Amino acid sequence: MTTKIFVDTNIFIDVFTANPDFVSESKAVLELCEQNIIEGYTTASAITDIFYLIRKLLHDKEKAYQVLGHILNIIKVLPVTNEDVLNACAEHAYDFEDCLQATCAKANHCSAIVTRDEKGFKDFDITLLSPSALVDQYKPK
């Protein structure tokens, strides 16, 4: 059975902005998803954020849709239910978006969240992995 991992938005941003400090590890996370070694998940709100950023970077709506199509071939979008939103609201978290993502990840049985922003998720009782920690788990030994 393939491991279900929630992929935080910053992983995508690293790849599409070619962030020199993080691009290789973040790209490796998405490659694990593309190779079906892990199942990668995100939320619809993250997808809208990603599309906006890609379109802004590329200055080309059609190219942004092509990139988004590729993402959607390797990442699945989790449902966000009314119950998820209510549960996240009840937390009164400092970062509501991270709280809602963690709530969705847990509700959909993701085993971990891969993120560079571990402090944003530390209070939500779900395993957190840096991109390098996740990639290291799947390196041939």
Residues of each region from the PLM?
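Acidic active-site catalytic centers that drive phospho-/nucleotidyl reactions
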Residues: 8, 98, 117
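Acidic, PIN/NYN-like endoribonuclease modules and their adjacent C-terminal/linker elements
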Residues: 1-4, 28, 74, 103, ...
